[in-house]
Amino acid sequence: MIDLIPQSLAAIGSGGLVGFTLGLIGGGGSILATPLLLYVVGISQPHIAIGTGALAVSVNAYANLIGHARKGHVWWRCAIVFAATGTIGALAGSSLGKAIDGQNLLFLFGLLMLVVAALMLRPRKTVVSSTVKTDWRTCWKTAAVALGAGAASGFFGIGGGFLIVPGLMFATGMPMINAVGSSLLAVGTFGLATALNYAVSGLIDWRIAAEFIGGGVVGGIGGMLLATRLATKRNLLNRIFAALIIVVAFYVLYKNSAAVLPL
């Protein structure tokens, strides 16, 4: 068993890394939370790692939401509808995730990481218009997308921003910056719903979660400060981080392939 002090340092450091990457490049950073909790911090049970990671992602998302809200980036009507509707999917997805064997779930998680990496490698389109009418009809169009994104978020215990942001842009036509800001309410709420579902089953390590979150807050501040200086190199940073995700994804697949692909 890992001693408490080294494990605490690993949790703080891992949280700092996730927070730093989130602050530096935005969406996709939280995908590393579960692998870090498993293979660096030393949580032995996959479901506990997923539940603990979901709680950490939730807190970080709400913290980032405050900054975006102050800048006027959040379109609250659509954000609230998306979060409320998607929470139903998150509860259903997390319930299904708890029922699946841990190694099988991690193998699927590894495949998801490859998808996230591929999406990060795609060039982002710049949207400059912000005149889209956000009436209730437009917002309700996002319900189906919200249910799907929430289910995926709950199933894997991730933020799901890589699904939510394009989903909001597709359904409402809102600019990227508003989709990013508005998505954070959903990311935080989905993560909270997933964490509560796992907590009911005793599948959260609260001490490690607190340490991971603490490291994430500090790392996030550092990442945001550095992001300002490296704004012109954002695409390069995305490619580098996508490559890191691919490496970790193959490691996760390798570690859990025996359960899915028995020889």
Question: Where do the language-model regions lie?
Answer:
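Transmembrane helix boundary and interhelical junction motifs in multipass membrane proteins
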Residues: 25-34, 157-167
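Transmembrane alpha-helices of multi-pass small-molecule transport proteins
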Residues: 52-66
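Membrane-helix boundary/interface segments in integral membrane proteins
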Residues: 194-199
